[in-house]
Amino acid sequence: GERGCASCHEDDNPQLGAQVNANLTDGVCGACHGRQKAEALAHQISDVHRDAGMDCMSCHTLEDMHGDGNAYLSMLDEGAIDTKCSDCHTSVASNSYHSMHGETVSCSACHIQSVVTCNNCHFESEVEVHKKIAYGQFKNWKFLLNRNGMVEIGNYQSVTHNGKAVVAFGPYYAHTIAKDAVSCGDCHGNEHVEQWHDQGVIDVVVWDETKGDPNGKNLVAAQGIIPIPPNYFEGGMRFDFVTRTAVGSGQWEFVKTGADIYQLLYGTPLT
């Protein structure tokens, strides 16, 4: 629904009088930003800023929260988010990593440890009982794409409905920062790059019935750093999809391999 002052500031008065709660906690932000909340709580992925006692508002500006007077379609629009790593990190260490990649690879592409992905949302549940139900969340991976001449972190959302499937990719920022999140070999010549070079496809999420899960949760997700290749929409990334056997059921079953629609917004494939 539409968000207003009381969505964050928790005032009992719907007309918002003079008294509002200005002491916001990360829990307020997490009420909407569920993946970021899951990074810290459900999956307990460390973050150097969080570990240092910082919270959301330590980095994000009032303009990020309240807007700057311009209308944006998405927080991914240029100018919509004011916060940058360089606001605090005015200089970087002199080393081979920064000298080699500093102009073409974003800070987050290397320093984010993992993204959290809500995989395979069962849209029948959203339509019929107004409840979001995903197959589950995957972690220990991150996707790479191009954006404005830089290699950036990406993520995706996948949805099924009545036998149809959609995958939408876009840039993403996870709050899972670490100093030594990757090594050279994590990107260069990793198993996903090699599979794409050899076969023209990357196995991202694959149905494996040999898992024998009693609830049919037999999807296996890739691990590590996964490039979004130029043929991502032509079978270059394998996604298997499942659906619930019925709305309200806890049982899942295989539906198909491959999405009916692929989208990549605010970025281009990694080349």
Residue spans for each PLM region:
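C-type cytochrome heme-c attachment and multiheme electron-transfer modules
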Residues: 1-14, 21-271
